[in-house]
Amino acid sequence: MDSKVTIGLIQAHHDTNGDRPVEEHKAAAIAKHISMIREAKKRGAQIVCLQEIFYGPYFCTEQTAKWYDAVEEIPSGPTTRIMQDLAKELGIVLVVPMYEQEFAGIYYNTAAVIDADGRYLGKYRKHHIPQVQAGPAGCGFWEKYYFRPGNLGYPVFDTAFAKVGVYICYDRHFPEGARALGLHGAEIVLNPSATVAGLSEHLWKLEQPAHAVANGYYVGAINRVGREAPWNMGEFYGQSYLVNPRGEFVAMGSRDHDEIVIGVMDRDVIREVRNTWQFFRDRRPDSYGDLVAQ
């Protein structure tokens, strides 16, 4: 397996007004992202990650049953199958965040992981579900209305190019799962997000570099861009990035443009950092009982 792997992180505006029907949102966003995935492949990407619930707006700023119609089963739903065919055609790994239905009324914020031969490898369900006011009165991250907390643990997927973990948006504020992904062997953790200026921006470039350093892996952080009507809860500030285990930014996107952020993950850097900072060796799990006792 090559030491170096090219990572593609896709950040994009959602171009359809929230008042439009759900299927119109999905069709337009899927077509847009297929085009961007193809461009990422042309630019050398081997692993490509899309933004949180890529085929819709960030609808969690309101609490409206309309958006339950955006759910799909994973992997049997149509979007997973489209992305399996695309991954196989292009020979790339895809991480595809979607709104998942387990069965009627049981819904998750989920990312499917698809290998370079088109095989579905599994999924990660977002663990930490926010309920936080943000932006104008009435707007917020009202995710408990839409999602149950994830129940599949912190899997690491052994893909054709790297061992990949996933941590979705609000998860990034919690170091425990980030550590679990490291202990499970992740070489890179991908964090598809939807977050706005004013609430979390000053944390955006702090928390995930810290996870990368503490766990000796790369982190790919993805955020959408622009403002989404009719809610206008705030500016999705983009700046998707790849950060290495030294805490150095390898690549970073713009604040306000559709963009494919390309960066290189290097296993030699992972090995060098882990051999220098022996954080896994020096852990004291025998003393951490308080973390799960309350």
Q: Which residues does each PLM region occupy?
A:
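Metal-dependent catalytic neighborhoods of phosphoester/phosphodiester hydrolases
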Residues: 53-72, 103-107
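Acidic/histidine-rich helix-loop elements
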Residues: 14-27, 135-137, 142
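A short, N-terminal amphipathic alpha-helix
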Residues: 31-47, 81-89
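Active-site-proximal beta-strand elements of phosphoester/diester hydrolases
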Residues: 4-18, 22, 110, 123, ...
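A conserved C-terminal secondary-structure "cap"
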Residues: 268-294
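Short, glycine-anchored, charge-dense loop/turn motifs used at functional sites
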Residues: 7, 113-121, 243-251
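Active-site catalytic loop in hydrolytic enzyme cores
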Residues: 72, 85, 102-187, 197-210, ...
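CN hydrolase (nitrilase-like) catalytic-core segments centered on the catalytic cysteine
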Residues: 75-95, 163, 168-260
